Amino acid sequence: MSDMKKSTVAVIDYGMGNLHSVAKALEHVADENTSILVTSDPAVIDAADRVLLPGVGAIRDCIGEMHNAGLVPSIRKAMAEKPFLAICVGIQSLMSHSEENGGVDCLNHFQGNALFFGEKHTDHDGSKLKVPHMGWNQVKHTINHPLWANIPDNARFYFVHSFYVVPENKSEVAGTCDYGLEFCVALARDNVFAVQFHPEKSHKDGLQLYKNFLNWDGKP
Amino acid sequence: MGLAKRIIPCLDVDNGRVVKGVQFVDIRDAGDPVEVAKRYNEQGADEITFLDITASSDDRETTVHMVEAIASQVFIPLTVGGGIRTCEDIRRMLNAGADKVGINTAAVFNPEFVREAAQRFGSQCIVVAIDAKKVSAEGEPDKWEIFTHGGRKPTGLDAVEWAKKMVEYGAGEILLTSMDRDGTKNGFDLGVTRAISEAVHVPVIASGGVGNLDHLVDGVIEGKADAVLAASIFHFGEYSIQEAKQRMTDAGIEMRL
């Protein structure tokens, strides 16, 4: 069988564990010519047709492990040239800086910061809101994008996070959510898309987003 | 418009089969965990909790395989509890595809374990399970205590204070079970649910005692729970998840439909 038509998706493994559900969800929607490779090998990432950057754990460890494993050049290269999707802490790692762990400099692909909701977070009417923001919330599309294809506006996705991103360039915001404040949950620029929620835990709409990613040519 | 309250069916799994629950003497078989999980996923469950109640540790391997099987087919969050005592136990379950782990007795005997686990794996995946029983007499101010061993052994720990301490140590969520109510079908203990939900900033899952759909509504509205967990009302087809969500929506609760 020829390898010519084979497509590969690199799921970046930087040693923080639990990429099982991301890989399984991608496999679930992938066709027989698409291989899902969970990898920490820069060469595999460089050779892949598309790249997914998951996020697990706290930001300091995340960024630290990316550097330790020598993955940052490959991540930057992928973001410069092919369809790239970051999820959860992955979106935060693409910002300039995060407030988590006393302040951590991140990859600065999107200018702006990841901020803490705060332990005394409140709703618009002043009532107490729990932090982390955990559960199913509605995602409003702020732009049309191939990754939103066949996903209804305001569909619910599964979130679990205590920090949220605030990009400087509002035109990069692709989706928002409301939790005491309206905040950015999806960012898009060129061939890079990033989401705060977990598509692999978001039932059919989450799987649809992964399917869209596998079909995406990297054009906005 | 905002965050939805969650319905979490719980699978109590003994020797590879879903059973009715620890508190029941006449354990009824409710099927294969993977099939049951798939059914709830299709019905629109917001998460699934898998509680391993197998007595012997030999069967842990079976649990790992089941978690793997569920996680490959069910794309909603999965919490695994029962017998989680070490960071190695947590790592195995997360690698098998669990999103969160429930720590119960081990937290009581070694609270530092919760801190260690939260630092290593992140608070988002650490659920501390609390089994509480009311210990105040009629007419006294309400007081609940933590019990272990299926509600048989008192610990002297105040439930509300313990919940606060666990959150301080890094718990990302509290699964609160009333041992007075578990298995009774008389509804949640709304007093302890509300007391703990108001005392901590992390989400609280109410558990123990659900006998009908109004109990789920009460858990959220009066108990201030962020999520409600039930087992037997769903297992034997008494109610579907959709029916439960519809009842909660009709009561004005925001749900994912």
From Swiss-Prot, chain B:
SUPFAM superfamilies assigned to the protein according to its UniProt record, in alphabetical order: Ribulose-phoshate binding barrel
Keyword terms: Amino-acid biosynthesis, Cytoplasm, Histidine biosynthesis, Lyase
Recorded GO MF terms: imidazoleglycerol-phosphate synthase activity; lyase activity
InterPro entries in alphabetical order: Aldolase_TIM, His_biosynth, HisF, IGPS_HisA/HisF, RibuloseP-bd_barrel
Function, in words: IGPS catalyzes the conversion of PRFAR and glutamine to IGP, AICAR and glutamate. The HisF subunit catalyzes the cyclization activity that produces IGP and AICAR from PRFAR using the ammonia provided by the HisH subunit.
NCBIfam families per the UniProt record, alphabetical: hisF
Protein name (record): Imidazole glycerol phosphate synthase subunit HisF
